[in-house]
Amino acid sequence: MDEKRLTHLQQLEAESIHIIREVAAEFENPVMLYSIGKDSSVMLHLARKAFYPGTLPFPLLHVDTGWKFREMYEFRDRTAKNYGFELLVHRNLQGEAMGINPFVHGSAKHTDIMKTEGLKQALDKYGFDAAFGGARRDEEKSRAKERIYSFRDRSHRWDPKNQRPELWRNYNGQINKGESIRVFPLSNWTELDVWQYIYLEQIDIVPLYFAKLRPVLEREGTLIMVDDNRIDLKPGEVISQRKVRFRTLGCWPLTGAVKSDAETLPEIIEEMLISTTSERQGRLIDSDQSASMELKKRQGYF
């Protein structure tokens, strides 16, 4: 393949497909983490291309906190049915028994117990030795320094000072028993790359990414969409209809919407071209403590 003849997006696509095939061939029991967001949708599309016309040689895993948007659950189930892939859904039952939720316990504890511990439980339960994730280096500073092959110890912890070199797209996947890796095929993509690829490939995504009137309240400068009756209204808070969309998706009480008129993919791309803020500005879990994301990754977060 002559890379000089490939467009920028074609080069990114080829690199990602190479990584996915490499991991599938090298590891005994890989899995693809499926968070239902735009990056997961792109990664799933790339995986289907990588093994077409065959089926995916690994399952998809959704670590469900019980607090995702209803439209995310509907999209997840519809996608699994349409494509026919194996979907594993894991929930931290101990956390649910403790009544852990983002309103009472805060974003840090909720994320640690329901997402990080839930993920570690699932990886241990099924014995996965490699897990694909849709994280990108342009999202956040700790992810910017993480390798494509991100090695984790027996406790799933990440040590940023103990990473292997990745020269000329050569990846060292040797691990000891009990260790594992997280793999990020979209590492070199940007948010704009993702949206342009979604547009060109006509990839189906959750409707929450498109602007429309939605019930929201403003809390500490963040627009929170009220998705069900579990909302914990504070004195003076008022729910109103505003035209908003989401640049990133997570648990609905911890995910801020942005004011927008972008109702189509071209309009979203145009919005991205003039944006000066990170898509993760709306993720409250990224700012719940100092060096929040790196600390979470050291503890086993994806």
Swiss-Prot record:
Family listed: Belongs to the PAPS reductase family. CysD subfamily.
Gene: cysD
Protein role: With CysN forms the ATP sulfurylase (ATPS) that catalyzes the adenylation of sulfate producing adenosine 5'-phosphosulfate (APS) and diphosphate, the first enzymatic step in sulfur assimilation pathway. APS synthesis involves the formation of a high-energy phosphoric-sulfuric acid anhydride bond driven by GTP hydrolysis by CysN coupled to ATP hydrolysis by CysD.
Xref: NCBIfam families: CysD, PRK05253.1, PRK12563.1
Species the sequence originates in: Photorhabdus laumondii subsp. laumondii (strain DSM 15139 / CIP 105565 / TT01) (Photorhabdus luminescens subsp. laumondii)
CDD domains, sorted: Sulfate_adenylyltransferase_2
PANTHER family: SULFATE ADENYLYLTRANSFERASE SUBUNIT 2
Reaction catalyzed: sulfate + ATP + H(+) = adenosine 5'-phosphosulfate + diphosphate
Swiss-Prot/TrEMBL GO biological process terms: hydrogen sulfide biosynthetic process; sulfate assimilation
Pfam families membership: PAPS_reduct (PF01507)
Protein's UniProt name: Sulfate adenylyltransferase subunit 2
Recorded metabolic or biological pathway in which this protein acts: Sulfur metabolism; hydrogen sulfide biosynthesis; sulfite from sulfate: step 1/3
Keyword Lipid biosynthesis listed: no
GO MF, one annotated term: sulfate adenylyltransferase (ATP) activity
EC numbers: 2.7.7.4
Keyword set includes NAD: no
